């Protein structure tokens, strides 16, 4: 098959271009003998600067998105808008593995990761590939995630490996960014779940309308829009549902307040699940409406796949939180420490409200920060949320990246109404220690922002930093001091 089939390209230099190639990469460090190197301009790195390195490593064909000096004895191909075309080249090279798979796409501001984990759980023994923020999993093999939705070339490689392992289903998080820049352009989805849409990524999308339109693209990529599952308690979900339901009557709507599929907390440790006028009481160990919403969405997808409600509800009882999602750390202390990925205003509301509902809880001590080089408009909103809903607030650092930490903190502080009624500790490790040392019996410490992440980004460098690791260490240290005294 011609790997350039279906796309416009211009041959700048032909050196045995029709040869059979052994691989394709956009990272020059991964290039081997007789590989194709794809050079494109990323947000921080321009691949055209690494052509020499790629050729040195064995590249025999260079795909460029702008004219360059052709000083090597290799083929050069010019392709405009290569980020959108890379998926076609990769698909041609790997013979379109995605067409032989059933792909479940999950999109929304919050809940994508938890939903993919829950869908996997509800599918029981069906082997799956799962792609998302925390990790990429192919059968029983787990790989570190680079992006929520990988580059199109990496996606196609994952699909190729999935097929070779005889796995049929792929569950993947689909970010708005990936929908906008073409990472999923060559995919047609079999099922799609919409969790919610709240403020985030406005540094990229600029407006909520643009953000919504990006998410909406997933549903236009469905083979059959009837295989949608949509949260209609969310205003944008309701809008999506209202648009599509007229011509697609089999869409499943869900929610706590409205929907074909409804759920609510009932007795302690149980939820009621209502579907087609049947109500079932199910044991449920997770706290917070956000976990209930994610579970309902996962149930909807499982139903669409063809799993019986009876089988689904048996598995609901065994659902556990994804790593770093409202994850409790138990080191024998008499106060609670919970780590959560919440880094948007809505997610912060959800975790604090969930903490409030914990039985015998006392004060809520919330640690939060805001990432650098990201949506600045959400920063004061998060401060207001933390102040309004918490008893104690500790403002700290959370991946400042290349932005001035002082600028980030200044933006955040504008949201505090009581100007001095919070703790400010820019050193995140010290902030965690401060919270643990001030905690009293039955207090609940919420360490938000990083969740599963094990790094802190300062400038362009990642430093090892694990909220859970530090919190456990400080809990144990405090207990040792108390035992001595």
UniProtKB/Swiss-Prot annotation:
In this UniProt entry, which cysteines form S-S bonds? none
Residue interval(s) of motif Meso-diaminopimelate recognition motif: 398-401
Quote the EC number: 6.3.2.13
GO terms of biological process kind: cell division; cell wall organization; peptidoglycan biosynthetic process; regulation of cell shape
Q: Does the keyword Magnesium apply?
A: yes
Q: Is RNA-binding given among the entry's keywords? A: no
Annotated residues that bind meso-2,6-diaminopimelate are located at 374, 398-401, 449, 453
* Cellular component, GO annotation: cytoplasm
PANTHER family recorded for this chain? Answer: MUR LIGASE FAMILY MEMBER, UDP-N-ACETYLMURAMOYL-L-ALANYL-D-GLUTAMATE--2,6-DIAMINOPIMELATE LIGASE MURE HOMOLOG, CHLOROPLASTIC
Task performed by this protein:
Catalyzes the addition of meso-diaminopimelic acid to the nucleotide precursor UDP-N-acetylmuramoyl-L-alanyl-D-glutamate (UMAG) in the biosynthesis of bacterial cell-wall peptidoglycan.
- The name of this protein is UDP-N-acetylmuramoyl-L-alanyl-D-glutamate--2,6-diaminopimelate ligase
| Organism (species) | Fusobacterium nucleatum subsp. nucleatum (strain ATCC 25586 / DSM 15643 / BCRC 10681 / CIP 101130 / JCM 8532 / KCTC 2640 / LMG 13131 / VPI 4355)
List the taxonomic lineage: Bacteria, Fusobacteriati, Fusobacteriota, Fusobacteriia, Fusobacteriales
């Amino acid at each position: 098959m011609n790997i350039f089939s279906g796309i416009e390209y211009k041959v700048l230099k032909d050196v045995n271009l029709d040869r059979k190639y052994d691989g394709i990469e956009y990272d020059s460090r991964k290039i081997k003998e007789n590989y194709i190197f794809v050079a494109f301009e990323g947000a921080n790195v321009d691949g055209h600067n690494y052509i020499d390195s790629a050729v040195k490593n064995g590249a025999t064909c260079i795909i460029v998105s702008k004219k360059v000096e052709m000083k090597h004895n290799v083929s050069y191909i010019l392709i405009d808008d290569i980020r959108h075309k890379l998926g076609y080249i990769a698909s041609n090279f790997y013979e379109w593995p995605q067409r032989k798979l059933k792909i479940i796409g999950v999109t929304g501001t919050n809940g994508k990761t938890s939903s993919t984990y829950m869908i996997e759980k509800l599918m029981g023994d069906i082997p799956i590939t799962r792609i998302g923020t925390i990790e990429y999993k192919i059968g029983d093999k787990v790989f570190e995630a680079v992006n929520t939705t990988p580059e199109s070339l990496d996606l196609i490689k994952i699909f190729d490996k999935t097929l070779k392992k005889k796995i049929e289903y792929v569950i993947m998080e689909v970010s708005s960014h990936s929908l906008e820049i073409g990472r999923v352009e060559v995919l047609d989805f079999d099922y799609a779940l919409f969790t919610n849409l709240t403020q985030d990524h406005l540094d990229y999308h600029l407006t909520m309308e643009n953000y919504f339109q990006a998410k909406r693209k997933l549903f236009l990529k469905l083979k059959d829009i009837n295989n949608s599952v949509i949260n209609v308690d969310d205003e944008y979900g309701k809008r999506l549902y209202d648009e599509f339901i007229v011509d697609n009557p089999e869409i499943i709507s869900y929610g706590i307040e409205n929907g074909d599929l409804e759920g609510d907390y009932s007795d302690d440790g149980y939820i009621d699940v209502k579907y087609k006028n049947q109500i079932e009481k199910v044991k449920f160990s997770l706290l917070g409406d956000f976990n209930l919403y994610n579970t309902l969405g996962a149930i909807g997808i499982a139903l669409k796949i063809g799993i019986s409600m009876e089988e689904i509800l048996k598995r609901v009882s065994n659902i556990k939180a994804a790593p770093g999602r409202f994850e409790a750390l138990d080191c024998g202390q008499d106060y609670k420490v919970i780590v959560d990925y919440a880094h948007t205003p809505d997610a912060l509301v959800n975790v604090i409200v969930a903490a409030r509902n914990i039985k015998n809880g006392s004060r809520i001590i919330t640690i939060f920060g805001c990432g650098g080089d990201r949506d600045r408009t959400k920063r004061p909103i998060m401060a207001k949320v933390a102040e309004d809903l918490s008893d104690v607030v500790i403002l700290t650092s959370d991946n400042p990246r290349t932005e001035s930490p002082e600028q980030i903190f200044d933006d955040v502080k504008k949201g505090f109404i009581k100007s001095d009624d919070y703790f400010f500790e820019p050193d995140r490790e010290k902030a965690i220690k401060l919270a643990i040392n001030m905690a009293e019996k039955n207090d609940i410490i919420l360490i938000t922002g990083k969740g599963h992440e094990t790094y802190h980004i300062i400038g362009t460098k990642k430093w090892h930093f694990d909220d859970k690791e530090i919190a456990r260490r400080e809990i144990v240290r405090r207990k040792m001091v108390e035992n001595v005294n």
